[in-house]
Amino acid sequence: VLQKVAVFRAVEAIDANNWDDAEALLKEAKDIGIVPKYNALTLYWQAEVAYHKGDVERAKQCYEDYIRRAPKSEMEYHFAHYGLGYANLALNKMEDAQSAFNTFVREYTMRDSYLYDAHNRLGDAYFAVREFSDARKIYNIVAQASTDQRHYANYQLAKIDGIDNKPKAKIDRLKSIVSDNEGAYVDDAWYELGRTYISMEKYNDGAKTLQEFVDSDYLSPYYVSALSDLALAYYNLGRKDDARVCYEKVVDYDPESADAMEAVRGIREIYVSQGRVDDYFAYAERKGLQSDMSAVARDSLTFAAAKNVYLNGDMTAACQKLNNYLDSFVSGYNRTEALFYLSDCYVVLEKNAEALKTMRLLLDHGRSNYSDRVLDVYSRM
């Protein structure tokens, strides 16, 4: 009687989330250890407590010990396999998880959320070891169910469509999830749809999808990632100002995050590519980006902007940018390279006097990687 009372009081404690009390009562029941039925039940509930408290190895052992002792007619027998499947998933023992969940779904007779959750976890165990055909079969079962578990299964099927190189099927399934607007995986599907378009280089579709997503759900856990991907889509469409606005929103959302640091790099790259270095410095000053306000950073970014114009072949504009750099940074770290590019601009523009003067400045600056090439051109001119 005392053993039975201890077990039932432990179950009551578990129902009340008093896990420490439950653990103590189950130890008491185990120490009594007289009745085989309650010895087995003690193991089952010890497994439940251990799993809840994060001791997954002990939970696995207790579930297995219970299964060896318990009659198959007991409901706990079925749920021991269910719990064992979860324990094996947590321990990354996917074959053992498959075995446990397969037993549960084969022998459990109720058509309820536990059954379809177990199917989903079985699908996950196959998915984790890249057995996608088996995973698809399992998820398809759940996708036809009426319980909420169908939403996860449908989302996983979309991912498998992508893995199986069926982009149209993946996109159609994701769009269906988004348009139905049911369940807990609408955000996941919406964001994944945008990413899928971008991975296929369908930047217009990706930008449209992600813009609608970020406009609709500021609180989504995918909000910041979606903004970063949206910036990438806009950048590839040549809409650099729109891309910069997205990056700025990432910085504003959480300035100290790794995402913000990546966004700052994107903002810097856009300003430099547009030759708007002073605008970037103004932004960096407003945001307190001290590392980008140093003399070295200003030198580097100002030169990078001028170099981009040169590499794009606009020699007239490059002359102006390079001269501005040389005037602003008399002892600049990139002075030699700037003089070389400037002299080449003048040669292309057939401004020979300016070219000779610039080459002379470069040669007088001392030995460099450009000395031999410049000396050859200088002597021939």
Features from the language model and the residues they span:
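Acidic, polar-rich low-complexity tracts and alpha-helical solenoid repeat scaffolds
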Residues: 1-381
